[in-house]
Amino acid sequence: MIARVWRGWTNAENADAYEKLLREVVYPGLQKINGYHGGYIFRRSQDGQDETEFVAVNLFESLDAVKAFAGPDYDVPVFEPEARRLLSRVEPIVRHYDVKIAL
């Protein structure tokens, strides 16, 4: 199992819209991908900051399944056009980890 981990940030006023887009568009689309095994979205806002951080952890059966989703440059984030509009900044690289323990 491969965990695909990525971070992005929205301005505070776009955070709810971005979360809604993930819930209603992005994740339903991911669930249709062969080899996709679910994921998590973590959201964090810190006092005094105008940005909200989102961390996406998506699980794939194999690196081949990741490549089928993301293409040959699988270390580059994949965005819906609307998601990119809502994000104020993004990590340019996605990290991939072998899942060794899942309880």
Task: Show the residue positions of the predicted features.
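Non-catalytic surface loops within mature trypsin-like serine protease
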Residues: 12, 61-62, 98-103
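Active-site-flanking beta-strand signature of metal-NTP-handling nucleotidyl enzymes
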Residues: 2-8, 55
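Short amphipathic alpha-helical segments
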Residues: 12-38, 74-82
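Mobile, glycine- and charge-enriched loop segments
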Residues: 9, 61, 72, 79-80, ...
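Short amphipathic alpha-helices within nucleic acid-binding modules
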Residues: 16-20, 51, 62-74
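Short hydrophobic/aromatic beta-strand micro-patches
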Residues: 9, 42, 57-59
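Short, glycine- and small/hydrophobic-rich beta-strand elements in well-ordered beta-sheets
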Residues: 27-55
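Glycine-rich beta-strand-turn "strand-cap" elements at beta-sheet edges
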Residues: 40-51, 78-103
